[in-house]
């Protein structure tokens, strides 16, 4: 059984091919053209053995990004491991929302930074970024990514729920917090549920807006006048998050769809009356 056939035990042909090409590109430096020219069939015996080990792990359900130890985000390669969420394509759109509405040079706080992909991308675009996370392991990965990509980000261990962090006025708050209700776990793909950190995924069923409420409250005290707040959200709660921001006194609240036409982002401004 070849690699594609092995992958097709779990994935359809299109997904299997995409994973196969990703592995060959990331681990062995082969382009799609190289594959079309058959260079994947001329790997050394050692490389073929490594390829088979990778394919077998992915076929059993382990996310290919964790197997390879990296994922692309906004054109850059970020280190990942099971202590951080795998950066999603849709999250790149939140970075673009920040860039479209907040000028470089302004201060940004990234709440729940994980791999650091949002914070680092914004820092490299010219923003002054501080990023927090409750997990030491996540912060270790984020710091490695910042060092590899030569990005200046201040990383701090902090829990937004338990403390009022930094007596500072920010131009923008950005967060992709846990937003999947615990009751939704049974509907999730096993390769997400079994490998990605539950701390970064789930929020209690009885308080799905927990993190949005806490961050919005923090923003009322620590955003500059006309400062922005940006959230990635569970599409089932986008309108509720928008209403929450309005209730907290934010203005110009907007809900933005992702590339899959799901309501994925909510942003607003703090405007003094």
Describe the residue ranges of each PLM region.
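Non-catalytic accessory regions of SAM-dependent methyltransferases
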Residues: 1-36, 41
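Conserved SAM/SAH cofactor-binding pocket of Class I
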Residues: 89-187, 214
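Active-site beta-alpha loop architecture of Rossmann-like, nucleotide-cofactor-dependent enzymes
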Residues: 65, 180-183, 236
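Conserved AdoMet
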Residues: 26-99
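Mobile active-site "lid"/loop adjacent to the S-adenosyl-L-methionine
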Residues: 179-211
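Conserved beta-strand segments of alpha/beta enzyme cores
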Residues: 77, 128, 152-154, 251-254
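Conserved Class I SAM-dependent methyltransferase catalytic core
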Residues: 205-269
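Short loop/edge segments at beta-strand edges and connector loops
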Residues: 68, 157-158, 257
């Amino acid at each position: 059984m070849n690699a594609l056939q092995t992958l097709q035990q779990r994935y359809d042909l299109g997904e299997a091919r995409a994973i196969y090409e990703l592995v060959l590109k990331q681990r062995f430096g082969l382009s799609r053209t190289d594959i079309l020219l058959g260079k994947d069939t001329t790997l050394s015996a050692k490389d073929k053995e490594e390829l088979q080990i990778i394919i077998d792990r992915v076929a059993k359900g382990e996310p290919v990004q964790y197997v390879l130890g990296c994922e692309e985000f906004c054109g850059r390669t970020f280190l990942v491991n099971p202590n951080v969420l795998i950066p999603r394509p849709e999250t790149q759109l939140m970075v673009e929302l920040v860039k479209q509405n907040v000028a470089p040079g302004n201060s940004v706080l990234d709440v729940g930074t994980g791999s650091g992909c949002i914070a680092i991308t914004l820092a490299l675009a010219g923003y002054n970024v501080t990023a927090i996370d409750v997990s030491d392991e996540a912060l270790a990965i984020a710091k490695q990514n910042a060092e590899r990509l030569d990005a200046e980000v201040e990383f701090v261990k902090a829990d937004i729920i338990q403390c009022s962090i930094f007596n500072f006025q920010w131009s923008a708050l950005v967060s992709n917090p846990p937003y999947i209700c615990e009751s939704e776990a049974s509907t999730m793909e096993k390769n997400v549920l079994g490998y990605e950190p539950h701390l970064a995924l789930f929020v209690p069923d009885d308080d799905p807006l927990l993190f949005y409420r806490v961050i919005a409250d923090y923003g009322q005290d620590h955003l500059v006048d006309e400062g922005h707040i940006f959230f990635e959200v569970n599409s089932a709660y986008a309108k509720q998050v928008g209403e929450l921001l309005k209730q907290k006194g934010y203005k110009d609240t907007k809900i933005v769809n992702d590339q899959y036409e799901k309501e994925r982002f909510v942003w607003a401004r703090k405007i003094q009356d």
